[in-house]
Design a protein with these regions (language model features):
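Metal-dependent de-N-acetylase/amidase catalytic core
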Residues: 18-31, 118-282
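Active-site rim/loop-helix segments in enzyme catalytic domains that contact anionic ligands
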Residues: 18-131
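Bacterial N-terminal signal peptides
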Residues: 4-14
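Residues that line or immediately flank small-molecule/substrate-binding pockets and catalytic motifs
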Residues: 8, 65, 106, 140, ...
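Hydrophobic side chains within alpha-helical segments
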Residues: 5, 42-44, 155
Length: 282
């Protein structure tokens, strides 16, 4: 008995935080994913496709235009922003999310941590209050420590966390309420992606949605093909025949497979935003 109690004390509290209703059974919820770039949602694509098919409303919000991510000297920032927006719209179509459910805040790629923080949080608060999500998907800011993410991912995770907290207090960014007719909103559930494997407590069976995740990933031609350094347009037929195979291998190699089933893993949290990043405290 003493050994059992000792074991229970050293297990991170987060492993017991799995959703009472399996994600595979969710229906009628509104989902908002906040990411840094126009492909950050890809690691959740199979889960998002499943949720959409199960009668949930799914929105994707991207903080930056992705207008820096290329090694092709022929492409300008403006051109790349347009290319990456269309890639994201096309990818979302593959998983059933319409263009009108895609929001891009227009910040420069690689510079999000230097953006006006109050303004950025205010924009996120606006969309949280407008959409009223039941569940937020975002990069994991960390559990009891800061998770290392590259700059835009790190900034997006903390901006999202702070915006969630601000959105529920009506006297913060009250112009949304007084002028825009929105209402304060508290998000009750969170699905964090991109964190450390040891912190993840929820595996979603996405076996039936693997091919849609692959099809969506193949739309990111400027990022995951030789278009990264020599962009020839969105059609993979314009690239070496090996590109499609390499892209597909990249996508499939990142899919978790156990006992013949495919999964996407998350750190699930239910509760106030103040406790999303730590266990019980005195």
């Amino acid at each position: 008995m003493k050994l059992l109690l000792t074991f229970l004390l050293i297990i991170p509290i987060s492993i017991f935080a799995q959703p009472a209703q399996p994600v595979e059974e969710w229906t009628g919820k509104t989902i908002l994913l906040i990411g840094g770039h126009p492909d950050d949602d890809h690691q959740s694509h199979a889960t998002l496709a499943m949720l959409k098919d199960h009668g949930n409303e799914v929105y994707i919000l991207t903080m930056t235009t992705g207008n820096v991510g290329t090694k092709d000297p022929k492409i300008s920032r403006f051109q790349l922003a347009q290319i990456r927006r269309q890639e994201e719209v096309d990818a979302l179509k593959e998983i059933g999310i319409p263009e009108e459910n895609y929001i891009n805040l227009g910040y420069d790629d690689g510079r999000l941590e230097f953006a006006d923080r109050e303004e950025a949080i205010g924009k996120l608060v606006y969309y949280i209050r407008k959409i009223h999500p039941d569940v937020l998907f975002s990069f994991d800011p960390g559990y009891n420590y800061v998770v290392w993410q590259k700059s835009d991912h790190r900034a997006a995770s903390y901006l999202a966390a702070d915006a969630v907290r601000a959105a529920e207090w009506r006297l913060l960014y009250e112009g949304h309420i007084i002028q825009d007719g929105l209402t304060a909103h508290a998000i009750p559930e969170f699905m964090f992606y991109g964190g450390n494997i040891s912190d993840k407590n929820t595996s979603v069976n996405t076996t039936d949605y693997v091919e849609r995740r692959v099809a969506a990933g193949l739309k990111y031609v400027s990022q995951w093909s030789s278009g990264w350094s020599d962009y020839k347009g969105p059609d993979l037929a314009a690239y070496p025949s090996s590109d499609r195979k390499a892209m597909e291998s990249r996508i499939r190699n990142r899919i978790i497979v156990e006992n013949g089933n495919s999964y996407e893993r998350f750190r699930y949290h239910k509760g106030p935003p103040d406790t999303m990043g730590h266990g019980p405290r005195d």
